[in-house]
Structure formats: structure tokens, C-alpha cells
Amino acid sequence: MKRLIIKLFLSLCLWAVLPVCAQDAVHYYFRTMDIRNGLSQNTVYQILQDRKGFMWFGTKDGLNRYDGLSFRIYKKENSGLGKNFITALYEDRRGNIWIGTDGGVFIYDPVLDSFTAFDEASDNGSIIRDFVTMIGSDEDDNIWISVENQGLFCYKPDEGRLLNHLHDSGLPNVTRFWLNGNTCWLALYADNLYYTKADFETPLQPFKDAEGNEIFKNDIINWQVSGPHNCVYIASLNGLTEINQTTGKTRKLLNTYVRALQFKSDNELWVGAESGLYIYNLTNDKITHLTVPDQDDSYALSDNAIYSLYKDAEGGIWIGSYFGGIDYYPTQYATFEKYYPIIGQNSLSGKVVREFCEDEDGNLWIGTEDGGLNKFNPKTKEFSPCPLAGLHYNVHALSMDNHTLWIGTYSKGLYSLDLKTRRSRHYLMGHAENTLNDNNIYSMCRTSAGQLYIGTTTGLNLYNHETNDFTRIHKMDGIFVFNILEDSKGNIWFATYNSGIFKYNPRNNSWKNYVST
């Protein structure tokens, strides 16, 4: 059995390598966290990982800090955070976290574990009080904040000075901004994409493509990321657009409402939309579209409306949605294929996998404690229902004896299934000496000599092929035999519950018991 498990592990590793070369074979498995796991609310607008590794999630009802095990929730009711609707998150060079809300900005000090309202007055007397759409910084570590109805602010921490731009311009609200050297790019709500000098001493200029078209006119821009080859990617109401800043040429990559963007690698752009998650391969322009499946799938996306994306320090992707909370795609999920129960599909029948066994044709028989026995074809990667009636739950042991599969169950005794004839037999505990000593089968081992040992919760049995019955090994009476293994010298080892380890040497019929001292 142990050799089989090692073989299976290597086989799974091989399967894991193949999707790297063949994009068609990639499967995406997500781990969902929502209010059932302690999240304060399921609408996740903002995601941030701080320098200590904590994950922060801004929701419509509270700020959440996740340590990998549990959530800590900050609200105005239990902290100095003055608002519960979190709209923006940013960590500055000092490690403080700036929190934008629907009514101002607050700063979290991780040393003091406290919040302070950012009440700095600007050069024109303005204090940030409205809906914050974004917080970022420039190369000089100045903090930039865009606010509905109040324009764009620039806070210079070294000077303690707050500047307010566009406050009296009559322009629509700034939804997104980014700074590239001395140039500030601004997306105005349902208006256009503009650029100007970062000191705002020059008028705003609308962006035009190489043909002179204002392609973002009347659009709503939600997100922007910089990519390879001096390209910028814009997420908007009208879709996903690539801008080559060297040539001025643009490409429309998607024609759906896009809210969030995140590069997973230089050539793989994750796109959060109202219609699900798109994974765009910039090398070959191939798109993988993931949505909530019709059938129940515990590892699928939890919601199609994606509002935020974030890549953590380990390369995992965090996905915030409108109704479904958080979906996490860790890097290790890409290493292995995952098989689990999916209602309405020919899938693995249970979640609690107990045993593996390979037959002569290379099929894998998988015993589960909550769903019975499964047959898996590694070539087609398909599951077949067990041909033996009654084995729909609690399989605890499997062993192959030529073309006969032996199946040990909890409380239902022992089954044998001839895989060629499909004939089966059922063995139960009896009063006679040549019957099983218990119906709770926990372990089995077929030795190199062809002997089949069956461990139960109350002892050990040896199957007699010629007489089709059993010999009870009284040396192990009353002992819970948890596992059985044959070593390279033909010795049989028995792992027990609370009785140590037994070694049996069949050559001289000797036993030795090893216990802790």
C-alpha cells in the first residue's frame, strides 16, 4: 500500500507538470472565505497585504484583518475607525495603512493598533469628508487621494502639507489616477481619461490614440495596471483596453464591464468583471473565462461580480466579489489536480479519502469514509460508480489479490470483488473460529508470499485461500490493528492503537513488540 501511495504521488506530480505546457489542461481551484468564516460582510471592495503579511479586506460593513487562520474586524463601534464602508486601502512607507471610506480618510498605526482620522486641512481649507475613490503615492512617497465632489488631494508628509487639485474645476469625480514620473493620469467619471503634469500647472489633456481618437470618452474607468513592453491596461465599463505608451496604439481585449485587474505573471493578466473572472494570456491572446458553475462546486468561484483583485507576496491571488466574499487562489493549488464531489457529475463520491489501491489494468480504486468506493481511470481521468451494491459509505481498507479486490469496511465486514467476473462475496464476524473476529476492518496487506492479513479493531485475521475462510491470530487478540506493512526482508509490521508496533517474522514464526518507554 505504501509503495502504491508513492507511485500515486509521483503520478500526480506528473499530471501537475502537464498543465504548465498545455494551457487547455489548467484547472483553477479556489478557497472561499465569507461571513461563515468570520468575514464581516460579503461585498469586498478593497484588498491589501501589509509588510507583516496580514491581509486586509475592505467591505461595505467593516475592515477585516486576516492572519491566515481568523479574521479580526474593525468597525466604528469597536475602534477609532469612523466609518464602516471601506472604499480604499494603501500602506505608506512607514507601515501605516491609509483607509478610504464613504466619509473621509483614517490612518491605522500597526504599532499602537489604533486609528486616527485624517483631518488635515488643505491649502484651500478643505478637509476630506466625502467618498474616497482611491489612495496611492508617487515616487517621492507623497500620498494622493481622490475624493468625490472634492477633487484630487496630494499630502506631503515631510512637510505636513495637503494640496487640493481640481476642487473648483467643475469636472466630474476622479475615479482612478496614476502617476508616471512627472505626469499624472486621471480618469473622470463617465467623462474621459486625461493627463497633465503632476504639479497641475498645465491644463488637462484628453488621451488620444495613435489615430487621434478619444477612445475613453464617456467611459467609466475602474482600474489600471502597468504591464510589460511599456503597456498600460485599463478596466472600464466598455471593457479591457491595452495602451502601448511607446507607439500610442491601443487594443480592445475584452468587451465586457471590467472592474479589477491584477498581473499574476508578466504575461498573465487576471481580469475581474461583472460576468466572472477572465485570465488573459498576453503571449497568445488566449482567454480563460471562469464563472460560478450551475452545479454545486466547493472549489469554484463564489460569485460572478468581481470587484477587487490582489496578488500576495507568495504569488497567490485574492479575489473580492460583491456577493460571495473572498476567493483565494494559492500558488500550490496549481501544482496538483484536485478531485472532489460535484453534484450532478461523475466525480469522487466522498471527501474523506481513506485508501488507494491499483488493479492489474492500472485503474485506481479509492475508498472514502463518507462516500464509499470509487474507480478512477488515470488515462481518461474519469470516475465510475462502484459495481458492488452496499458499498456506498465507510471504506477503511483496500487490497488487491491478483484480480480480486478486497474491501474492508467500518461495521459492514469484508467484501471480495472479482474484477473479471464481477462476482462478489461478503464476509462477516461469526462465532466460529474460522470467521472474522470483527466487522470493523481497518487495515489489510497482501504479502509477497500471497498471504492476506486483515486487521480489525479487536485483532488480526489471516485469509485462507484454499478453504475460503479465516484464521484468527490470537497473538493480537483485543488489539486495534491500524496499519500493516511488509518490509524488504519479508517481515510483517503491525501498527496498533495504544499497543505499540509488532513485528512478525514468518520464517521462524517469531513476534516482537515495540512500545514507548
Would you name each region that the model predicts?
Residues 1-517:
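Carboxylate-rich, polar loop motifs that coordinate divalent cations or form catalytic acidic clusters
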